[in-house]
């Protein structure tokens, strides 16, 4: 099944996608991971992406579509994967429909106040990249990783100022996708404000219902 996870930053769609990729052998395609790989490899696209992200803006369609299409073309099984963070707007959705058929959409619903709390509190270990949260998953020692004792840091785009810009961009560009997919009966909403186990359980129920309809 080809799944698209929609939802604002901090809605937990990336975490759930990784869980499904491990438990159900879905191939997880994260635009965030693709962007970071380009940045780490210091590619021409990576340099461009880095500047855009540090300014708290969304990466433009031309770059995003190319990065995602290139990745999809490397997958052997193109019938069983999750797209996380793509598409973000109608233009990208149209391009995705050109590339793939029978896409099903999971829309992660969560209120903005909880989003800001989740993201502004996020801290990442510089050494092992484990993720913590000063509000919901604090470390035993302040700013020190529980696993490797590495130093924690806050991403520049996780500050409250950057988050406001990111959420404004999301509301402006991505929310119209809800109508786009709803009109074609591909939209499935899920309450992402619950804990991760409940969200996973509800998602499995949705996937099961979709599979029954496809039989």
From Swiss-Prot:
GO terms for cellular component: cytoplasm. AMP binds at residues 31, 36, 57-59, 85-88, 92, 155, 166. Zn(2+) binds at residues 125, 128, 145, 148. GO terms for biological process: AMP salvage. InterPro entries: Adenyl_kin_sub, Adenylat/UMP-CMP_kin, Adenylat_kinase_CS, Adenylate_kinase_lid-dom, P-loop_NTPase. It catalyses: AMP + ATP = 2 ADP. Residues 30-59 are annotated as: NMP. Catalyzes the reversible transfer of the terminal phosphate group between ATP and AMP. Plays an important role in cellular energy homeostasis and in adenine nucleotide metabolism. Consists of three domains, a large central CORE domain and two small peripheral domains, NMPbind and LID, which undergo movements during catalysis. The LID domain closes over the site of phosphoryl transfer upon ATP binding. Assembling and dissambling the active center during each catalytic cycle provides an effective means to prevent ATP hydrolysis. Some bacteria have evolved a zinc-coordinating structure that stabilizes the LID domain. NCBIfam families: adk (TIGR01351), PRK00279.1-3 (NF001381), PRK14526.1 (NF011099). This is Adenylate kinase. It comes from Borrelia recurrentis (strain A1). The lineage of its organism: Bacteria, Pseudomonadati, Spirochaetota, Spirochaetia, Spirochaetales. The gene is adk.
């Amino acid at each position: 099944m080809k799944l698209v996870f929609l939802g604002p930053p901090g809605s937990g769609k990336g975490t759930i996608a990784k869980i499904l990729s491990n438990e159900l052998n879905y191939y997880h395609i994260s635009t965030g991971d693709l962007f970071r790989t380009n940045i780490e490899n210091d590619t021409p696209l990576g340099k461009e992406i880095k500047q855009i992200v540090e300014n708290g803006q969304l990466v433009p369609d031309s770059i995003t579509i190319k990065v995602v299409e290139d990745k999809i073309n490397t997958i052997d099984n193109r019938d069983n994967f999750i797209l996380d963070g793509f598409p973000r707007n109608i233009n990208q959705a149209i391009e995705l429909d050109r590339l793939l058929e029978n896409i099903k959409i999971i829309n992660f619903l969560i209120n903005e106040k909880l989003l800001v709390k989740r993201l502004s509190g996020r801290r990442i270990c510089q050494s092992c990249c484990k993720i913590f949260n000063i509000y919901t998953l604090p470390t035993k020692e302040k700013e020190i990783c529980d696993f490797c004792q590495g130093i924690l840091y806050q991403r520049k785009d996780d500050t409250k100022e950057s988050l406001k810009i990111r959420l404004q961009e999301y509301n402006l560009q991505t929310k119209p996708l809800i109508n786009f997919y709803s009109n074609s009966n591909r939209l499935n909403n899920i309450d992402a404000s619950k804990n991760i186990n409940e969200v996973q359980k509800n998602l499995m129920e949705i996937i099961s219902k979709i599979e029954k309809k496809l039989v």
